[in-house]
C-alpha cells in the first residue's frame, strides 16, 4: 500500500499575503476604495478568506453576528445586479427568496445590522456595468442613511503585465464613472501586489519545513532555494520576466516532491524528486496522461511484446537471385515434361 502524505491546507502568512492583506485592512479601517490586481495563482482568495475570518473573530458574538469584512466572488456570466445582490445576501446567511425589488432594500438594512464595514469583490474583472452601478447605489444609500454608514470597497482582480482591469471603465467621461473614480483612494487608487523574491521564497520554505517536520524528521528545503527559484522563474511560469515566484506553483512543486519522497519512506526530500516535480510544471506541463484500467495496460504491454517477438522471429526475405534459383528445375527433372 502506497503511503500518502497528510497535506497542509491551511493559510500561510507569506510576504505576498502581508502586502495584500495590508491593503485590505487599510480599506477596512479607513473605509477607502481600491482596485487591486495580482497575478493568477498568487494567493488572493486565501488572503481574503483569512482576513474575513479574522475580522469576524475580532468583532465577537456580543449583540449578535457581525461581519465587518464581507467578501463575495463576482458572479460569472450573469450581468444582472440581482446576481451580485443575491451573493451578498448569501454571505450574510440570508436566502434568496421573494422578489429582488424587495430583497434589494432588505440588503441595505442587513448590511447596517450586521456591522459590515468593508466589501471585497474577488475576481472583480468579471464585474458588469449593472454590477458596478449597483455597488455605487448601495454605498450611496448607506452613506446617506442615519446614522451614516460609509463602506470600504476592494475590487480584487487578476491580471498580468502593465494593464489594470477596470481602469479603462473608470476613465470614461460619463458622470457615473467620474463619481466612481472620485471615490477611489487618492494615494493608492490602483494597486499591483507583486509576488515573491528569492529571499522570500527561502522564508516560505523555512515555514514549510516546520509544517512538514512530523513527516520528515530531517527535512531541509531551504538548501534548495536557488534551484527552486530558478525553476519557478522559467519563461513558461514567468512570461513577463518579473523574477517573482507565485505561491501556487511553489506549493505544487514542493508538495509533489514531498509526496514522492514520503511514499518511499525517506527522511528528507531528494533532489531527483524536486527536479522531476519542476519538469512536470514546465517541460511536461502539457503532456497528456493516459488513464486506463491496470489490467488493460498489462494486456497492451503483453501484446506489444508478443508483436515485437514475432517480428524478430520472421525469416529474412530472400534476394532476387535466390528466388530465381528456386524457380529453376533440377538436373534430374526434364525442363518440359511430356504428359503421360
Region roles according to the model:
Residues 4-16, 47-55, 67, 77, ...:
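C-terminal alpha-helical "lid" subdomain
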Residues 16-29:
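Pre-Walker A adenine-sensing motif
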Residues 29-51:
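Walker A/P-loop nucleotide-binding motif
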Residues 54-64, 94, 143:
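Post-Walker A helix-loop "phosphate-sensing" segment adjacent to the P-loop in P-loop NTPases
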Residues 69-97:
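Conserved NTP-binding/hydrolysis module of P-loop NTPases
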Residues 70-73, 137-227, 306:
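The catalytic "switch" region of P-loop NTPases
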Residues 98-114:
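Conserved alpha-helical scaffold flanking the Walker A/P-loop in AAA+ ATPase domains
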Residues 110-131:
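Conserved P-loop NTPase "ATPase switch" module shared by AAA+ and STAND
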Amino acid at each position: 500500500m502506497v503511503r500518502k502524505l497528510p497535506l497542509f491546507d491551511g493559510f500561510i502568512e507569506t510576504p505576498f499575503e502581508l502586502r495584500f492583506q495590508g491593503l485590505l485592512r487599510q480599506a477596512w479601517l479607513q473605509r477607502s476604495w481600491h482596485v487591486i490586481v495580482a497575478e493568477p495563482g498568487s494567493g488572493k482568495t486565501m488572503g481574503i478568506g483569512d482576513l474575513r475570518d479574522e475580522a469576524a473573530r475580532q468583532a465577537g458574538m456580543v449583540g449578535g453576528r457581525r461581519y465587518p469584512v464581507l467578501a463575495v466572488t463576482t458572479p460569472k456570466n450573469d450581468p444582472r445586479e440581482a446576481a451580485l445582490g443575491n451573493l451578498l445576501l448569501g454571505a450574510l446567511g440570508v436566502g434568496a427568496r421573494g422578489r429582488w425589488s424587495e430583497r434589494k432594500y432588505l440588503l441595505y438594512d442587513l448590511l447596517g445590522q450586521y456591522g459590515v464595514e468593508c466589501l471585497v469583490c474577488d475576481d472583480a474583472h468579471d464585474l458588469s456595468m449593472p454590477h458596478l452601478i449597483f455597488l455605487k447605489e448601495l454605498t450611496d444609500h448607506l452613506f446617506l442613511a442615519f446614522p451614516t454608514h460609509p463602506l470600504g470597497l476592494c475590487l480584487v482582480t487578476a491580471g498580468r503585465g502593465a494593464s489594470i482591469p477596470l481602469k479603462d471603465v473608470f476613465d470614461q467621461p460619463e458622470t457615473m464613472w467620474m463619481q466612481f473614480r472620485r471615490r477611489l483612494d487618492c494615494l493608492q487608487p490602483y494597486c499591483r501586489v507583486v509576488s515573491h523574491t528569492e529571499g522570500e521564497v527561502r522564508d516560505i520554505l523555512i515555514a514549510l519545513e516546520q509544517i512538514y517536520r512530523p513527516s520528515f524528521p530531517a527535512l531541509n528545503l531551504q538548501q534548495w532555494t536557488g534551484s527552486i527559484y530558478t525553476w519557478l522563474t522559467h519563461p513558461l511560469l514567468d512570461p513577463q520576466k518579473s523574477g517573482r515566484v507565485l505561491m501556487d506553483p511553489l506549493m505544487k512543486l514542493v508538495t509533489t516532491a514531498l509526496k514522492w519522497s514520503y511514499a518511499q519512506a525517506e527522511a528528507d526530500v531528494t533532489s531527483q524528486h524536486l527536479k522531476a516535480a519542476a519538469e512536470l510544471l514546465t517541460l511536461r506541463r502539457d503532456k497528456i496522461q493516459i488513464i486506463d484500467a491496470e489490467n488493460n495496460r498489462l494486456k497492451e504491454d503483453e501484446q506489444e511484446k508478443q508483436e515485437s517477438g514475432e517480428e524478430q522471429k520472421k525469416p529474412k526475405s530472400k534476394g532476387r537471385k535466390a528466388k530465381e534459383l528456386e524457380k529453376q528445375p533440377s538436373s534430374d527433372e526434364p525442363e518440359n515434361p511430356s504428359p503421360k
